[in-house]
Amino acid sequence: MTKKNDVTRIATGVRNLDGLLHGGLPRGSVVVLAGPPGAGKTILTQQICFHTASVRQRVLYFNTLSEPTAKTLRHLTQFSFFDPRKLDVGGVQFVDLGVILRTKGLEQASKLIMDQVRKIKPAIVVMDSFRVFDDLARSKEELRKFGYELAVNLMAWEVTTFLLGEYGPLDISTNPLFSVIDGLFLVTQREQSGEQQRFIQLVKLRGTEHSRDEHSFVITSKGIEVFAPRVTVQREDRGPGAARCKTGISKLDELLGEGIPRGSSLLIAGVAGTGKTVLLLEFLYRGAQAGEKGIIFSFEETKERLLATARGLGWDLEHEIQRGMVEIVFIAQPNIMVEQHLLMMQERVHAMQARRAAIDSVSVFLHKVKDPQIDREKVFQLASIIQNSQAVGFFATDIPYGTHQLSRFGVEETVVDGVVLLTSTEEGLGRQRYIEVYKLRNTAHLKGRHSMLVRSGGISIFPRYDMDAELDEPPPPLEPARRHPSGGSGSR
């Protein structure tokens, strides 16, 4: 248990959930977990119980008519958090209320519950499902009396109580139970961004500051894992600092002036075939040769294809991987889960202590996002990962064909610190590539388009020295982004 502001809290043991609760659940709270069948209420509660349970902190788990205890235990064995030793020593004790509810009613069930509490003196009590009591109560008055007396008695014993039920929005506004409880967690499941996702929302929790946003979560063999980038990926209050990064790419550093400020993120924007992936790979390869670790998150090309590209350009990228200077993380497009992989990227950058990070590409990573506001928020979170680690990030993005945008929605470039624009035009019987440093905050850089070639050895740039250097100042505070036509992103 932990203390915060003189309130004793119980750690849940669920990844990132304690962060949403600012340290854990206040001891003695009566909390309702509401949601439809299959949303994850029971697994979430059981994971908290087995994390907390010990000989000194016992758990009383009351099963009602919804599911017999034997079936509950059979399902529990699938999860790594399940520890049968805690059953053997009485740390977790299951009690079946089904028979007494069917034969004796609410009053006798309440008496049995409190008799068990006095006998066991638990730290946690669970009732799964509490909705059964609603169905058995003869009136709202009886239900209110039962719920109030039970809550008061359990609070007197400083017992943290979880009441699970298939409650919906109408129940929350009309059921008398919700007027006496301390906390309400909504657990739901629905389709979002083209995939079925589970969400948890902390609607109410007395005596504690907490996030009120919806946060996605998954159920795995380890149990429940909550993804909350709005809480866990927050930008630290720090400026770019004086340190600068030289890319090591031929002539690009001349365009960039004194270098890229540490903590900066650059959008590498262009249509298909303009050299975005090659630029990202060379950025990491040259960094590794200069002693800077780098990582690339690829959502399009597999590790093998990226290595083949590097070999074709004459780079021994495999050697840099073997000596721990470069890491390639491939996630296939159908497997992308934005919030989960945001946290994964944060952890991998931190664990590697990467000085350079590349994403290929943000347009594919966020391809299921249809709302420009959400797209902007996620790019901001990616940029925050880079700034907090004081690395330098190169984010490839596809420009929609036939538009003058610099990104998919036309809002991402307002979030990042710099934009490098890659283009190509027909000249004679071929195409000529160009590179332009469109913006780079706090850095005097060379303006205009400059010729670029991709050939053996990497990228070659031919600067036009008749262009003037320009300093990009930090912009004023951003206003809420307006919706732009999305257009389609070009495929590679």
Language model: regions and residue ranges:
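P-loop NTPase motor core
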Residues: 31, 106-180, 184, 278, ...
